[in-house]
């Protein structure tokens, strides 16, 4: 299932939108649920029943919590804990059982057989969606949902189902009953859809091809320069892939009358890791802040407990992305660096010139992505070793020169695309008082869209990276 396929762009989305606009108001949510289930079945038909059962379960648990929370606090808390454990155990079974058993096998004198069930599409995202609902109802941030169709739509709404953004229930609850489609929403949605699609098929997929070519090099052929180019290609690919999906999801939500909050805010312009994580995958960071970090005590505790809380959150963040120790190490890596920024290095960094802080942040993030994309620690250490001069090959050898010479234009466009300049130029065209500006902006969008079509026709398109999480 992919938002950047010809079938989705030219058939599934427009047909769904036309039916939605023609549908009577009382049936609109039911139609969106049907469309969302068809979308899910397109990508994961085996687990459609699981999605439905999980949705029914959480609806019932939420109703029970809502009925108890005012008069029976202890009972409501018991039901909340039961609901949370059920969701986490389900996620754990499908995503972490094999990982846990493989880890145990390393210490046991015998070998346990690890089950390997296929991962249900979007399970990490819809699990966090359900946990948000149960917590928000218990803490009275929003009333429990009485209408089962409205709740089903909250969980299964197809634009956010596969790769987010993770929409907290308290934010979306007021929109579930009434979400009118307006001209302003449509005018915001179309550029987000087109530019999000362009990020994916024009930038992310081509950057991914360059990264895969470097990853395919034999260990003896990988020089320091090639390794750095590969890490930069991946850093840009991941950003454009995921932010492109988020833009498309937010744009599609607007077409159906919903307002989702932004999920990215030019993270590679950050001057610190703290700032980077306020700008990257904003909905996930907000979820961990609201439902894990703050309940643990947040920053309003002793320094030792604050350190504990931050490390717990970041190890969990790493494991949320994938069931392996490299993901856990990636989370721990960022947790430690954030603690260093917060405590011993705070004064030093405040006195450091902004350009240097920006470069240091980029270096820290790129090094972290090596852990993120490496299948195991030995691969990560080998790759990092090459980046920092290990091995007998010249740093900037003929292979590195070749990859730079064949991809420098893509690299330049990618770097420029990380900033707000292209969007600012488009907005200036749109808000120009002259009709010419509006016409030029429309032509620009049409041109970008037409440029995307040949890439969508290519049968070797790549699925969105975050769909695997």
What spans do the regions from the language model cover?
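Membrane-embedded transmembrane alpha-helical bundles that form the catalytic cores
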Residues: 1-468
């Amino acid at each position: 299932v992919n938002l950047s396929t010809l079938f989705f762009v030219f058939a599934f989305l427009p047909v769904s939108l036309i039916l939605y606009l023609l549908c009577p108001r009382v049936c609109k949510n039911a139609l969106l649920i049907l469309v969302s289930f068809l979308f899910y079945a397109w990508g994961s038909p085996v687990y459609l029943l699981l999605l439905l059962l999980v949705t029914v379960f959480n609806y019932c648990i939420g109703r029970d919590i809502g009925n108890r929370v005012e008069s029976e606090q202890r009972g409501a808390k018991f039901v909340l804990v039961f609901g949370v454990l059920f969701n986490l155990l389900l996620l754990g079974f499908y995503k972490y059982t094999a990982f846990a058993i493989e880890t145990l096998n390393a210490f046991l004198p015998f070998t346990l057989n690890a089950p390997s069930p296929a991962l249900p599409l979007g399970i990490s995202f819809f699990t966090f969606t359900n946990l948000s609902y149960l917590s928000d109802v218990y803490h009275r941030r929003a009333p429990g949902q009485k209408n089962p169709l409205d709740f089903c739509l909250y969980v299964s709404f197809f634009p956010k189902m596969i790769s987010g953004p993770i929409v907290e229930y308290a934010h979306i609850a007021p929109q579930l009953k009434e979400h009118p489609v307006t001209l302003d929403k449509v005018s915001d949605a179309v550029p987000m859809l087109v530019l999000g699609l362009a990020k994916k098929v024009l930038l992310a997929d081509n950057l991914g091809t360059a990264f895969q070519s470097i990853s395919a090099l034999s260990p003896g052929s990988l020089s320091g320069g090639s390794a750095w180019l590969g890490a930069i290609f991946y850093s840009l690919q991941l950003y454009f892939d995921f932010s492109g999906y988020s833009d498309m999801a937010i744009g599609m939500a607007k077409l159906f009358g919903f307002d989702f909050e932004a999920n990215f805010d030019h993270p590679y312009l950050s001057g610190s890791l703290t700032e980077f994580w306020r700008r990257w995958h904003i909905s996930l960071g907000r979820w961990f802040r609201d439902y894990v970090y703050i309940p643990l005590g947040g920053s309003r505790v002793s320094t030792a407990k604050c350190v504990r809380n931050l490390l717990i959150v970041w190890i969990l963040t790493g494991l949320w992305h994938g069931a392996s120790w490299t993901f856990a190490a990636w989370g721990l890596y960022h947790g430690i660096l954030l603690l260093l920024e917060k405590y011993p290095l705070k004064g030093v960094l405040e006195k450091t010139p902004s350009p240097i802080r920006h470069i240091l942040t980029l270096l820290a993030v790129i090094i972290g992505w090596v852990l993120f994309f490496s299948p195991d620690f030995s691969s990560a250490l080998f790759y990092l070793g090459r980046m920092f001069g290990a091995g007998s090959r010249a740093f900037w050898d003929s292979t590195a020169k070749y990859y730079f010479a064949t991809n420098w234009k893509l690299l330049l466009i990618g770097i420029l695309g990380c900033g707000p300049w292209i969007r600012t130029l488009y907005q200036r065209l749109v808000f120009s008082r002259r009709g010419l500006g509006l016409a030029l902006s429309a032509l620009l969008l049409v041109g970008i869209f037409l440029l995307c079509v040949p890439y969508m026709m290519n049968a070797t398109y790549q699925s969105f990276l975050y769909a695997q999480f």
